[in-house]
């Protein structure tokens, strides 16, 4: 019997495929049964209502996209009243993504969202820390450590720390999150990028800059997922540019115990369901008994020792 | 003001199925210099549409055209009996240029039907459509629906020039009173449009007004709606990524109860209350 | 008369198109007259002979490539004996790219390469600093400042500092380089990435990881070029993913005074010559009199104030 | 050892022009299950080739196949009189699959001719070619050249099975003594090959040996070359980005004067001295 399950701390997922925050919502239930997924991950919410960034909020770049949605949020109360009950009908665990501009606000939101129906909290620490210089918490080990420590005190639920690629210290940040008590890492959020319309000479995003996601981003996020898996003992959830079942397999081989699918769902809304089938087929034909056997099976030999922590391109 | 606002406020998630299917191209031909008509061989399942709804098209990728995101396109016609789905589109950039390369027999993947369409309330007898350019694409199925429901229809069709006016015959066949206006003949200005509509209101009366796109027309109809207490709806556009409500990129601002609220064009729209809409 | 020239410190280039280091060599002269280019930029050299990284040294990722060539080098003496004389036959200025593992070695190489025939020195500070923790000099403002200060003392030639995208401190690093005396910034080198062959489960590069270049990288490098142009007064040379004349225009609008073309030359070896023609056509049809008028003409309004220094994806 | 090493050491940059041209496809057809023959309508300028040289092909991009880098391909035939350039290729991955989609009349951009080809020194009368599989592609133009120069040619062609053996007739037409060996008939093993070659050496003698690719064959010929003091050349492969010498990704290691040196396959190769080559 093929075993598709994967373990993320205390949580067992029936398969390693789940959506990425901000690229999934209740509406997708109009396309397929959401209970086929390993977990459900909601768009990041904030405590207060927020309207998000100016439009245009997305633009296309060669084979990928940029977004500057920001975090429009109906607020905590609306979320508890409408969203959590919606997902109650499913067996798949609900992962709630949260964000705030300071460690204290972060911690109090974390506490208040630790309610029945929520299986784990994903902390989007890739958002700017307004108390410091506006750099995201996850850009530095110190701020990562500080915020995760507070969050750890605020909840008994599993805490997933979502990292940012906008740093030169991926492994240090990963270790700081682990040390401060994160139960898993999500690697990663989008990479800061820009596009300009050469006809109007205006930035293509209302917000000037935005995050790169989609296929172009894959080799970068895969590298980060690999680095993190090599440097921490907590599970790593891969995220970035995953568009095909081959991409899923690549991340699992690199060491991710599960993956999140973002932009690909915009292009092919059934893709997550198809990936689950595709993964099953792959494992069967390759003679694997379980997803676990595939995870971290990269044949990196000696190379890994010297190179894992290399963070300069050669 | 006592115009009854139409129920365009966020409705609880409706779990109508949405389909993502590959359809064979029956025809894809120029309609005039700027527009093309795409006819797909579509399964019955996706043809349960409401006028004003749209599909999200996965445009083909080739050596020279590599659109990545899908492209939203209003339903120009849906014909369950013939199994046909029609789009009328203007070639503007990479995605629509890629659409234009499709030939008979090739396939195109379409997601839909999507969004909230137009309403024709039971007591709306005299309907006014005001369309400009490719806006006709969006309003055409509404005209057919009105015809089926036996409503009286006036269609004001505006365009740059005579030969840019499409589908006039189609509207006439549906029994509409068609009023063509063009920039060339100097008849398409707002002043003239206002005079024509006010005459119509004075003559038979108008129960509801429908339009899409143009800012100038939106403002005119909002003003007329307020003055004469006539409800209306408008179909709006915004750039889309997911097309089904997940990404929140397609928001536009609306006036509602003295506040400005953001709504998703793909989900709460693309059809919105005329008075709540804000031009851009 | 259309003015294609661009000014980089004391150097006037006849047009803003030049190759990127490591993607250009004498052999390209077999395809077109290299004197059409604004400048010639050599592959990074080191003082000693080096053989570079294990193969495979390149691999393909969706619409782009990774490389881990490393810095194979015939050494300083061979370079002076063979390469500099070769480029002497051209009017286009010769820019020599150098690298070393410590500030002292860097400075002494810089001094020894300051010879007739060399118009400027590009310092590849995206290479690992072996004295520190192996992170590239250009990953931190402090190490950037230290190395550029020494280099500045070592030569009278113009110094171009080539930055790395593997940092969360792009603008700080840019300012450090400026403060320490760099005459221009090249933005940027490749971004650390990875790919795994799912059939063999081996990394696709012999070196495990490598640098992403090509179209997928463009929105990231463009964002960096924009951030740098907004935060320093020295000229910025854009580099990253430029494949078409539209890309050249986008970088110039963003604030780059010139651009370097890398990977695109591998796909279309005549591309630089074509871009010069294309730029000329664009400027003429758009009614510009000079390249200068286009540089930095991005219509970023108020947005730029708040956003330039944002280094977290929204 | 007194084998004269061939001049494969780095030569000063030769400034022979290299062309990047778009050619129309004349034919692109399967040769047997695994191989395809691509015939291009090529301008005279790019047909001044040396056997063993290669072109760098810009494979077509489609919805499903999106190769990015170019793909190196040996010249299988160059015919200035007919204006034709031939490639014989095996469909292995994305690039070659994309090549296989080309149909007559479509165009393909090719960069070349590139690299250093085979040498046939004036005093080499009896030549031995040993090829396996697609290696024939690389050696075929060498056979033609040998024929034109009036040299005696022995061609040992090895393959998995009878039907994988290509171009035997072509080699025979060129007057070669063709010796087919297959895994199926158990004749392709190294031992048998050695016996055949040694018999040939004893009989007419061999002045030079040429091969490509296979490790087993390389080792065999190196050993025979040393024993019998026969020079030889081998065409090697390595992944390429630029194809013209700029990127240094295509290096392989060679023994030279007691040291191991890296050489660029695209530039110092793809043809190298047989004894200097290192298998992998
Ligand atoms: C609900 C809806 C219905 C539509 N119906 C029609 C129709 O029936 N006929 C028709 O010709 N056009 C229609 N449009 C507009 C159509 O979607 C755009 O013309 C098309 O997306 C342009 O893509 P492009 O790649 O050719 O142009 P580009 O300008 O290259 O597109 C770049 C990006 O901007 C987006 N974009 C550009 N213009 C628009 C626009 N007006 N609205 C939304 N996104 C845009 C594209 O989707 C793409 O993501 C509709 C738009 C919406 C939102
Ligand atoms: C000088 C030279 C001459 C060649 N001549 C021929 C020929 O005449 N006929 C023929 O069938 N093949 C030939 N090859 C091999 C051919 O280049 C590869 O089969 C082809 O590149 C595979 O590309 P792909 O995308 O189909 O395969 P993939 O495996 O998907 O390729 C992935 C990457 O690896 C590279 N690659 C894969 N295999 C090879 C290889 N053997 N050599 C170099 N790069 C490789 C590709 O170029 C590409 O960059 C030659 C190679 C070289 C270097
Ligand atoms: C439109 C959009 C909105 C997003 N919103 C969020 C968000 O609210 N919170 C978050 O942590 N990540 C958000 N992300 C990032 C994704 O969760 C994911 O990390 C990223 O897109 C990389 O994965 P992908 O390449 O598969 O899309 C968003 C991404 C996109 C494209
Ligand atoms: C094969 C290869 C070799 C490179 N070698 C060097 C180098 O030696 N020194 C350097 O500073 N940058 C080197 N680079 C980086 C390029 O100069 C350039 O910064 C990068 O590729 C981004 O530009 P592109 O996307 O146009 O290729 C190399 C890039 C490639 C692809
Ligand atoms: S397009 Fe994604 S929410 Fe509307
Ligand atoms: S392929 Fe670039 S040097 Fe050989």
Please state what every model-predicted region is.
Chain B
Residues 2:
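Anionic-ligand-binding alpha/beta catalytic cores of soluble enzymes and soluble regulatory domains
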Residues 7-104:
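Ferredoxin-reductase
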Residues 19, 262-280:
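Short, basic/aromatic-enriched C-terminal tail that caps enzymatic domains
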Residues 94-241:
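FNR/FR-type flavoprotein reductase catalytic core
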Residues 238-270:
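Local cysteine-cluster metal-coordination motifs and their immediate loop/turn environment
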